[in-house]
Amino acid sequence: SEIYDSHGYGNPDISAIRNFIAQEYHEGKQLKNVLLLGKGTFDYKKKLGGRPNLIPIYTSRSSLDPLTTYSSDDYFGLVDWGLGNWEEDATGDATLRIGIGRIPAISYVEAKNWLEKTIAYEKQELVFPSSSLTFLADDGDNGVHMRDSEVHAALMKEAHPFFKHHKLYLDRYEQINVGGAQESPEAKKAVVERISQGTLLLNYVGHGNETTLMAEEVVQAQDLQNWPQQTQLPLWFTATCEFGRHDSPFLRSAAEELLLASDKGAIGLLATG
C-alpha cells in the first residue's frame, strides 16, 4: 500500500510498482534483480473470486485472443527513462534492465515453505550424481523435439563438459493405449527415478499445457503428491505451452505446484505461460 500511495495515488496500479522499481534502479545504481512474493492474476477488479491478486501482473492489450494474449512480469523490469507503454512489438521492444522473478504464493505458509526450501538448497554442496543434466523430449512432429534437445545437450557439453547427461526421450519408451489415448508408464517412471536420484537441471522440449507435459501425460501436476522427497531440486526449463501459467485465479499450473511443493518439485523454473 505504501508503494501505491507514493507512486499511484493510492490506486493498485502495476505502473506504480514499476515506477517504484525504476526509481530504486536509477537512484541507487545497485538494483539488479527483483523478486515478487505473491500471486498475481488477470482478475484486477476481483470480480471472479478464486485465488487472491496479491501483486498484480501485466496482461497484454490483446487479452481475448487465445494465441496472442499473455501475462508477463517483464513489465516491471522496463525501467528506462521516458518509457511509458510497453509496445509489445518484437521489432521495437524495450530492454529489460533488471531480472524479475515471482513466487506465486497465496499464504504465509506457502511463502515460508518456499523460503525454507530455498535456504536448504543453497546450503547443499554440488556433488555427483546430483550435478547432472536431464534432457526430456516429446515424440512426434518429425522428431523436432529430440533434435532441439540434442542441440541443447551439445551446447551444454561444450560449455560445461564435466556434467553428466541423462536423455529421457519419449520415443525410447513403450506406449500403451488406455481408453483410446496413448500413455507411457515407463517414461513416467523414468522421469520420477531421475528426479529422485538427483539432477541439477531438467530441460523439456515438446507439447504441454497448464498441468501436463506430453499428450502421454508423462508429467502431471497431480502426480507431484506421490513423488518421493528429493535430495537435489532441479531447475526446470520448459519449452512448451502454458506449463508456467500463473495468472489464473482458478487454476494452479504445474509450474506453480512444482515451485511451492515442500521438499520436492523444482527450485525454480523458466517456463512459458
Name these PLM-found stretches.
Residues S1-G273:
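Cysteine-dependent hydrolase recognition
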